């Protein structure tokens, strides 16, 4: 049975001229493999406005699965996120100058939401293709976590049939020419996100395997 998968990526932020999350996601717009039929939308790196754009994308596409994607400069792996927390704590301003500190994303909402994606299975499938991947247990407190939490809150309140989650990706090589940081090719990132979409479309349940962090 076909599953429509909505992928979102952000516009550039923090002085960057490119955001690999959108560069990879837009490559997959219209792609189909197995039961996964992929559509892509860009969201702004702006608190609350990103959620408004996401809600409109949900209305437009009526997806079965939503995977939001964001850049995590400094990471060297594809990292599906385990948990979103109800906190905006911005170290830098967003693209419209907003810099909330100690603010709830959803007043009265739960402290956190778990992902709705089979993230351990996604990690294993990505690693089978020789692409580095690992489960992450923190999505930060900037717009990525904001969108992740907002997505799961929206699903919980209004779209219980949708499964959703968030994946962080590294820089691409062109972003690291003037700084020392790990990167991954755009081809590898795009391939990994396609694997994630197909895996989520095929499997609702995750695998039982060891993981976690010691600190």
UniProtKB/Swiss-Prot annotation:
Its main location: cytoplasm. The keyword Repressor does not apply. GO terms for cellular component: cytosol. It is an enzyme of class 3 (hydrolase). InterPro entries: Peptidase_C15 (IPR000816), Peptidase_C15-like (IPR016125), Peptidase_C15-like_sf (IPR036440), PGP-I_bact-type (IPR029762), PGPEP1_Cys_AS (IPR033694), PGPEP1_Glu_AS (IPR033693). Disulfide bonds: none annotated. One of its GO terms (biological process) is proteolysis. Homotetramer. PANTHER family: PROTEASE FAMILY C15 PYROGLUTAMYL-PEPTIDASE I-RELATED, PYROGLUTAMYL-PEPTIDASE I. Removes 5-oxoproline from various penultimate amino acid residues except L-proline. Belongs to the peptidase C15 family. This is Pyrrolidone-carboxylate peptidase.
